[in-house]
């Protein structure tokens, strides 16, 4: 007989060569393969179907052990969580103890809370609810917290409780990095970026609109008081223009009018009733104006020296962000983040409400001095900081300023040709204190122009005037104003720029200029895109500073871990100024101690 067997469930044989091999291996008679139906015919063969048995690894999630195992046995010895544990354990947190009460329920240990929050920030977990979830699910968080499980409210209260002391922890960490050779604190690369606030985008309050509406309201108040022909209204008026009225003055006038209406005789005639109703309407309108005036005064008080603020975050100022999807220059509420870095470690940071950079540099240097009781030897920044006030501060403080000015890059172009009619291109005689115009005429000094910055710094510019400019053949190219040409020159600023040009074009200056592009800019890129820190998550300047201080600590520890890992890959060959850190030695000793304890327990 003939047994009819399909190919697919038995063997995948696609050629006569495969059939021949099957015959030799199984000692089959010569089979016949139908070319049409692809069916294999075996004659006088009793075929046994054979299937391979799959063996899985043992799986028993309910398996118990005789001795409890260490939770960190599955955590690598060089894992960043161990670095966080070691760094926080070696920090002194005595200032945290005064934040807790002696009575009541025992709180969670501040070191455990600090480790959990910082490690959460290192893993892009900025929400207290996400950190709470990680403390229940992630083995790294569970080991770091020692099986403690604080809820999100407890984590949030801890962050708010230590919002003043967390800056001190950041300072201690940077000092430790300097002691271990990661940084030197001798050079600081400064730059800024705008970080959007948590406030909504369309909650703006503008100074110009507020002042304009307040002037209109004062005109309405003056017109209303002129309609009130009571003697006490004229006595309470503080000035003819009505600009000195306060909400309390208007409320006092309204109360006096109400009292006179109550104490007056009841109206009898229709005309008296109409007159009384008109007075009541005026009193009501006066109270409304008083409330509106109080609202405008409160807005101006919140504005301070700024031009805008957000209704939901009074400390946020509307600024133009780099992330402009519509490409229309739309302003959003945010903060100006100033940052100083070295070797891509954050040395110092500051949050400012002014969008401009020149006004923040001196305050930022004072913050550095307050943290480390010294100033950096060198400062590197872009042209946004190249003002006379900043140059003078750095020169008096003994800081070598590698700071660009406005047209530095334009001067460095290969085919740059200066304008022969600009004041910088004219010949200056320092002894006679005069300039020589392109036609050879002397431009004598006629006075000094003074201007004051928003910080109160006074700049002085010498004014020089030419003679007999009428009929000059170069007048059209020289200037277009009427009369003789007048120029203003800031000699002190020109001298600062000359020194900055010499530093920036030197060999060391070229090296610093090259590193500035990969120092703060790289930190901003890692912050916004690698760690997804593009927007603040709190309202108010104090909480925003607290949140970024936690982030800066987490960023520096994460950068330290990556630096240590890179050195380990390179075979431990470290530069002389960056020796093997003591943190790695501490971790190694700690791991050896833990392994010894576990071996003793097993024995």
Predicted regions located by residue number:
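Short hydrophobic targeting helices and cationic amphipathic motifs
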Residues: 12, 19-21, 28-29, 42, ...
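Hydrophobic alpha-helical membrane-insertion signals
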Residues: 45-82
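Short, positively charged and aromatic/hydrophobic N-terminal segments
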Residues: 27, 34, 41-49, 588, ...
């Amino acid at each position: 007989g003939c047994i009819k067997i399909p190919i697919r469930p038995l063997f995948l044989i696609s050629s006569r060569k495969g059939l021949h091999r099957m015959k030799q291996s199984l000692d089959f008679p010569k089979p016949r393969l139908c070319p049409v139906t692809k069916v294999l015919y075996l004659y006088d063969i009793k075929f046994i179907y054979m299937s391979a048995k799959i063996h899985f690894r043992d799986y028993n999630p309910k398996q118990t052990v005789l001795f409890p195992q260490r939770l960190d046995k599955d955590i690598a010895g060089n894992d960043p969580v161990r670095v966080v544990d070691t760094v926080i354990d070696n920090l002194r947190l005595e200032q945290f103890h005064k934040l807790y009460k002696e009575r009541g329920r025992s709180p969670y240990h501040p070191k455990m809370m600090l480790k959990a929050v910082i490690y959460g920030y290192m893993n892009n977990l900025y929400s207290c609810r996400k950190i709470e979830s990680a403390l229940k699910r992630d083995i790294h968080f569970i080991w770091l917290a020692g099986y403690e499980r604080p809820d999100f409210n407890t984590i949030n209260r801890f962050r708010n409780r230590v919002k003043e002391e967390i800056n001190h922890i950041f300072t201690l960490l940077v000092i430790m990095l300097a002691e271990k050779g990661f940084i030197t604190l001798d050079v600081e690369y400064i730059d800024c970026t705008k970080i959007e606030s948590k406030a909504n985008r369309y909650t703006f309050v503008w100074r110009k609109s507020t002042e304009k509406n307040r002037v209109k309201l004062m005109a309405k108040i003056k017109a209303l008081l002129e309609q009130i022909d009571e003697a006490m209204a004229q006595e309470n008026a503080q000035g003819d223009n009505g600009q000195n009225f306060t909400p309390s003055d208007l409320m006092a006038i309204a109360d006096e009018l109400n009292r006179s209406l109550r104490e007056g005789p009841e109206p009898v005639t229709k005309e008296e009733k109409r007159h009384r109703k008109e007075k009541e309407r005026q009193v009501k309108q006066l109270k409304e104006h008083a409330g509106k005036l109080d609202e405008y005064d409160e807005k101006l008080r919140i504005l301070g020296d700024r031009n805008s603020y957000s209704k939901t975050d009074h400390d946020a100022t509307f600024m133009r962000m780099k992330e402009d999807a519509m490409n229309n220059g739309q302003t959003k509420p945010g903060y100006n983040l100033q940052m100083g870095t070295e070797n891509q470690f954050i040395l110092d940071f500051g949050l400012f409400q002014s969008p401009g950079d020149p006004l923040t540099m001196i305050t930022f240097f004072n913050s550095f001095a307050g943290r480390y009781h010294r100033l950096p030897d060198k400062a590197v920044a872009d042209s946004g900081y190249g003002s006379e006030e900043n140059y003078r501060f750095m020169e008096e403080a003994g800081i070598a300023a590698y700071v660009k000015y406005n047209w530095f890059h334009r001067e460095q172009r290969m085919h740059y040709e200066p304008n022969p009619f600009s004041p910088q291109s004219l010949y200056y005689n320092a002894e006679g204190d005069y300039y020589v115009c392109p036609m050879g005429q002397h431009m004598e000094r006629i006075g000094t122009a003074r201007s004051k910055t928003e910080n109160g710094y006074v700049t002085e510019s010498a004014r020089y005037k030419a003679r007999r400019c009428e009929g000059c053949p170069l007048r059209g190219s020289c200037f277009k104003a009427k009369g003789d040409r007048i120029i203003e020159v800031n000699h002190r600023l020109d001298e600062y720029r000359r020194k900055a040009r010499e530093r920036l074009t030197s060999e060391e200056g070229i090296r610093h200029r090259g590193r500035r592009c990969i120092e703060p800019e790289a930190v901003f890129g890692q912050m916004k895109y690698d760690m997804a820190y593009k927007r603040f998550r709190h309202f108010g300047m104090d909480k925003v500073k607290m949140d970024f201080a936690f982030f800066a600590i987490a960023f520096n520890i994460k950068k330290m871990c990556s630096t240590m890992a890179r050195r380990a890959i390179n075979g431990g060959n470290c530069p002389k100024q960056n020796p093997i850190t003591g943190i790695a030695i501490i971790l190694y000793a700690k791991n050896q101690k833990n392994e010894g304890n576990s071996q003793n327990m097993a024995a």
